[in-house]
Amino acid sequence: MKLRLLTLGVALLAHGAPAHADKLTDLKPVTDEGLQNVAPGNWLAYGRDVRNFGFSPLDQITPENVAGLQLVWARGIDPGQVQTAPLIYDGVMFLASPNETVQAIDATTGDLLWQYRYRLDTDPVLLNAITQDRKRGIAIYGENIYFSTWDNHLIALNMRDGKVVFDIDRGQGDEGVSNSSGPVVANGVIVLGSSCQYSAFGCYVTGHDAKTGEELWRNYFIPKPGEEGDDTWGGSSYEQRWMTGSWGQMTYDPVNDLVYYGSTSTGPASEVQRNMVGATQTGINTRFAVKPKTGEIVWRHQTMPRDNWDQECTFEMIVDEIDVKPSAGMEGKQAINPDAKTGARRVLTGVPCKTGLLWQFDAKTGEFIYARDTAKQNIVGHIDDKGIVTVNEEKVFKADGSPIDFCPTFLGGRDWPRTAYNPDTKVIFVPMTNACAEITPRTDAPDPANSYNIRAVYKLPEGKTDAGRIDAINVETGETVWRYEQPSVNYAPLMATGSGLVFSGGADRYLKALDQKTGELLWRSRLAASIMGSPVTYEVDGKQYLAIASGHAGYGAALSAVQEKKTDMSNVGSAVYVFALPDSK
């Protein structure tokens, strides 16, 4: 760890009316209580709060009046794969965008309050190309805004002026280690994962003191020789164990004082090329529950062993108190633990992997409760009543150059776009893609620079004509409430409101609202560019606003190859848009 006292970044304070300056001056430090019980008008984390619900209790915009939404303001942002979720704190929007930029913006007018731009001092050729322009999340705590950089730094900015408080170099940025999803704040600790798709080693999660940036702990995923799990890597040398990291969004449960994160797969994709035939590989595709102060692993559960298909299990899961009562007749049932206690329990639940399986665990102990399919998949062969996964042997690579057909693709099923969860109805809304693929291991020698070393051709699952999809599932029973499908790829995060709406973007450039009860499309508005940003909502002076950032179709463009009719996408015109209902006369 290195502390860079003289930052290469630049903060610019905008010169405007005193009212704008007052908004920044009046901001009070954000406390743990404030993050864990967010005031209704604020949005203080990627999923609004540390539990990652992606839900706001605001109810001014309703199914009955959503069609009246009008654009209030918009402003251009740096171009790139815009996947960001703005934070809103007492009328100030904090926005991270491509090209290592963080801005403070007046949330009611769109006026710039300050801007910080980080300047790389590493040759971009050495950096992780996948995370180049992706800033999904930033964090706020105390008086600071926290974000991670392309070259693997953790930076804290003063929220009032954008000046650097600290800059921590976590190391190996010039060897491809990076982060795209940003940190979570857990009881005074900044917890941050990492991505190393092109690296000849594994990655880690770190915990940092929120005031100083001091690294408190570092957890690796790939076992070294002699460590627990070493014998599950097929006798391969440590130098052959590549890429496993944790780049998805994390969740914090203040009741149990646990941070939950998930790990990714390894490379190359083919276990034949890895020299690990049949090896389950402890550490990959695993859900971890850790103590934020120390990094102590309290429990773990592997949700996709022996991964030949890049089915990374690193996406957010949510924590809530529910009435556990899994239905034996749930659609896509894989397994129900007959020994798991039903009734009131605090659970960790969600869709953590690209396979699209919905998993549920006891939040404190990790006891498996149930698992079910959502999207079409044929690579999980069996899950027993303890949640142990066996893969479908027919879909495992046997030789280089020999293709297999499998579902879903290495883009999901479900990928990183955020789910939304209504804690009142206990329904989770999951963005997915109907897609399968033919993948072939390349015959050239595997190398970290080639990542998974495969070729892929996408197609729709048999019997499907629509690529885009959103499922609503009751997490208490596991039963499907409704399913919304559309011709174009969705591949965009979701947001739910207390008034009964679900908002989403998509590759087709539409910002849309669905009815939470039925899945009916109620409203949509077409923006200049495709939408991968996370919708958020907030309230200032009694008025509710809806915000979304757009700018790129991302992998939605690749997935569109499955569609019969091509989507009208655009990667030009990156901007943040803010909508509201017209003032009553």
Question: For each predicted feature, which ranges?
Answer:
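Hydrophobic or amphipathic alpha-helical targeting/insertion segments
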Residues: 104-112, 136-169, 175-221, 358, ...
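Blade-level signature of beta-propeller repeat domains, shared across WD40, Kelch, NHL, RCC1
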Residues: 536-585
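Phosphate/diphosphate-binding loops
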Residues: 318-375, 379-380, 398-409, 414, ...
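Repeat-blade elements of multi-bladed beta-propeller folds
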Residues: 43-47, 79-101, 127-154, 178-202, ...
